[in-house]
Amino acid sequence: MRLRQFIWLSMTQTRTADVSRSTKETEISVSVNLDGTGKADIETGIGFFDHMLDSLARHSLIDLKVRCKGDTHIDFHHSVEDTGIVIGQAIAKALGDFGGITRFGHAYIPMDETLTRASVDLCKRPYLIWKVEFRRDKIGEMDTELFKEFFHALAGNGGMCLHVENIYGENNHHIAESCFKATARALRTAITVDPRLGGKPASTKGSL
């Protein structure tokens, strides 16, 4: 038991990352602590997006700090997609070689009339399945099509095979929020260290 505790502590003490990205369209910095308590410090300049990222942090228990300055005078596309890129990169960096983690996670999240499920495999083979439809083009000032762009960027840069499916729902706010919460809960399981793995990848191949 002492050996397992040592392995667990040695892995979790370093599961943090800071990543910055600067282009002509956006300037973004992200800090993550995978073994946090879900603290969120989010400023993207997009109110509803901030709300969604807050949910992502709180329900994954990942401490998440995001600062984004983007060309929102044009539209929100660059800010949302690029934020997904940097959060994904930060999670992947914090995971290191992806060894010793549970790897898989899934969650069903109900939100009033809405039910959404998410499944994730932290396998370094990025893929997104997105089966989500909205009844309106916007939630607040944010285009609903941008949610797919965010999750595509998150999965692509986080080494995630991610499936998100809204099973049913009517309220667009509930549909969007349940997608973030379901993904958060799936990640919460997948990033959990399993000391029985001894720091090795959860793979029959011995590597990811």
From Swiss-Prot:
SUPFAM superfamilies, A to Z: Ribosomal protein S5 domain 2-like
Keyword Oxidoreductase in record: no
GO process annotations (BP): L-histidine biosynthetic process
Protein name: Imidazoleglycerol-phosphate dehydratase
A cellular component annotation (GO) from this entry: cytoplasm
One Gene Ontology molecular-function label: imidazoleglycerol-phosphate dehydratase activity
Pathway participation: Amino-acid biosynthesis; L-histidine biosynthesis; L-histidine from 5-phospho-alpha-D-ribose 1-diphosphate: step 6/9
GN (gene name): hisB
